[in-house]
C-alpha cells in the first residue's frame, strides 16, 4: 500500500520487465536442451524489435529438462521485483506448442476480470507471446517438431506479492509476469498503473458497481468506514488519478468515489492527473483564488498565499469560515467529470492527515 505523500528523486536508468527475464531464461534453458550449449548471457528481441543481451545467473541441466535464471534489473524504477531471481524450467514435450506453468513465486488467477482465464498461471499475454516466438524460432533452427513445457518462477515471489495488489485482484500464490514492451521505463510505474486497471476490471467482472479510488492508507480506511465497501471495490490509485479516470472511459462503472489527502486533491483540482511532486505541485495562489471566489477577505488570501503547506492554507480558510475543502473537491469533481463518461456518477472526498473528512463534492 502506498503512503499518502511519497517522495523520490527522479532517476534515469531503464530496466527490463519480468516478461523479458522469463523470455531470456526460457530461451537459454531450451537452447541447452536442443543445442547442448549453456550460455552465461542470451540475446532476446523485444516486442518493438530492440535486441538486448541479458546476463544469466546459471543455465544447467536438470533431471527432466533444463533451467536458467537471471536477476531482475528494473533500472531506477521502484519495482518490487528489482533484484529478484527469476527462473525458467523447460522440458521438451511430444505435443507441439508451448504450455505455461506457475512455478514457485508466480501466482495463479482465481477471479474473473483479468486478461487470463481463471486457473491460468499469472503470466500475461505479451510475455507468453515473447516466449512462444523465441522458442518456436529456436525449434525451427534445430529442426525440432515437438513442444515445450515452460515453468516460470520467482525466488521469494510469494512474499513479494504481498506488497502488490495481486491478492486483492485474486492472483494467489505469487507475482505476475508482466510487460508490454519488455522495458521498464524509470518511474513510469507501468506495472502499478496496470494493476489499477486490473483492479477496476476485476471489480466490474464481479458485479461491483461502486468503486472507491484512494491515494493511500488513510483515504482507503476512510472510504471503507464510510461506505462499508468490500476490498475488491477499493482501488489503490496512489498518485495516478488519471489512470483511474481514463480507464473508466473504456470500462465504466456506475459510481466512482475518489478520496485523497487535501493537498493531493488540490493538484487534481488544478487539472493535474499525476499527483506526485515530481510532476505536479500545490498551487497556493490558486487555492487563495478559489477562496476569494467564495468571499475570502484580502487578508485571508494573502495569508493563504504565504502559507507553508496546503494544510496550513486549509486551516486558515476554515478558521475564517471559508469551506476550502469543499471548494477544492468541487474543482476536482469538474476535472474528473470532464474525463469519465456521463454515465459514471462521481464524488470526491478530501481528508486531512488524521484521516478526517475536510471536504466533499458530488
From Swiss-Prot:
SUPFAM superfamilies associated with the record: CbiD-like
Keywords tagged on the record: Cobalamin biosynthesis, Methyltransferase, S-adenosyl-L-methionine, Transferase
GO biological process, one term: anaerobic cobalamin biosynthetic process
Reaction equation(s) it catalyzes: Co-precorrin-5B + S-adenosyl-L-methionine = Co-precorrin-6A + S-adenosyl-L-homocysteine
Cross-referenced InterPro entries: CbiD, CbiD_sf
Encoding gene, per UniProt annotation: cbiD
Organism this protein belongs to: Burkholderia lata (strain ATCC 17760 / DSM 23089 / LMG 22485 / NCIMB 9086 / R18194 / 383)
Family: Belongs to the CbiD family.
Name under which the protein is recorded: Cobalt-precorrin-5B C(1)-methyltransferase
Tagged with keyword DNA-binding: no
Documented EC number(s): 2.1.1.195
GO molecular function, one term: cobalt-precorrin-5B C1-methyltransferase activity
Amino acid at each position: 500500500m502506498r503512503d499518502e505523500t511519497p517522495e523520490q528523486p527522479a532517476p534515469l536508468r531503464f530496466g527490463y520487465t519480468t516478461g523479458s527475464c522469463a523470455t531470456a531464461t526460457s530461451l537459454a534453458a531450451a537452447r541447452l536442451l536442443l543445442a547442448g550449449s549453456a550460455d552465461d548471457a542470451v540475446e532476446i528481441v523485444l516486442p518493438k524489435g530492440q535486441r538486448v543481451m541479458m546476463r544469466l545467473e546459471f543455465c544447467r541441466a536438470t533431471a527432466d529438462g533444463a533451467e536458467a535464471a537471471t536477476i531482475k534489473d528494473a533500472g531506477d524504477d521502484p519495482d518490487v521485483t528489482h533484484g529478484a531471481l527469476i527462473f525458467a524450467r523447460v522440458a521438451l514435450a511430444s505435443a507441439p506448442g508451448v504450455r505455461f506453468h506457475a512455478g514457485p513465486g508466480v501466482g495463479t488467477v482465481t477471479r474473473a476480470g483479468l486478461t487470463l482465464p481463471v486457473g491460468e498461471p499469472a503470466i500475461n499475454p505479451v510475455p507468453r507471446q515473447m516466449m512462444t516466438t523465441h522458442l518456436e524460432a529456436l525449434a525451427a533452427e534445430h529442426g525440432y517438431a515437438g513442444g515445450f513445457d515452460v515453468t516460470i518462477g520467482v525466488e521469494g515471489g510469494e512474499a513479494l506479492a504481498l506488497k502488490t495488489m495481486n491478492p486483492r485482484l485474486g492472483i494467489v500464490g505469487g507475482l505476475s509476469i508482466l510487460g508490454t514492451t519488455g522495458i521498464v521505463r524509470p518511474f513510469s510505474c507501468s506495472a502499478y498503473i496496470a494493476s489499477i486497471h486490473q483492479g477496476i476490471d476485476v471489480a466490474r467482472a464481479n458485479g461491483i458497481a461502486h468503486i472507491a479510488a484512494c491515494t493511500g492508507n488513510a483515504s482507503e480506511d476512510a472510504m471503507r468506514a464510510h461506505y462499508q465497501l468490500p476490498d475488491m471495490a477499493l482501488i489503490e490509485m496512489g498518485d495516478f488519478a488519471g489512470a483511474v479516470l481514463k480507464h473508466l472511459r473504456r470500462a465504466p462503472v456506475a459510481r466512482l468515489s475518489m478520496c485523497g489527502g487535501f493537498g493531493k486533491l488540490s493538484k487534481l483540482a488544478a487539472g493535474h492527473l499525476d499527483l506526485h511532486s515530481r510532476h505536479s505541485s500545490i498551487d497556493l495562489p490558486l487555492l487563495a483564488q478559489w477562496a476569494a471566489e467564495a468571499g475570502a477577505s484580502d487578508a485571508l488570501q494573502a495569508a493563504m498565499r504565504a502559507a507553508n503547506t496546503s494544510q496550513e492554507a486549509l486551516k486558515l480558510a476554515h478558521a475564517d469560515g471559508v469551506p476550502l475543502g469543499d471548494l477544492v473537491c468541487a474543482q476536482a469533481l469538474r476535472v474528473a467529470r470532464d474525463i469519465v463518461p456521463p454515465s459514471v456518477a462521481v464524488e470526491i472526498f478530501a481528508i486531512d492527515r488524521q484521516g478526517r473528512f475536510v471536504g466533499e463534492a458530488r
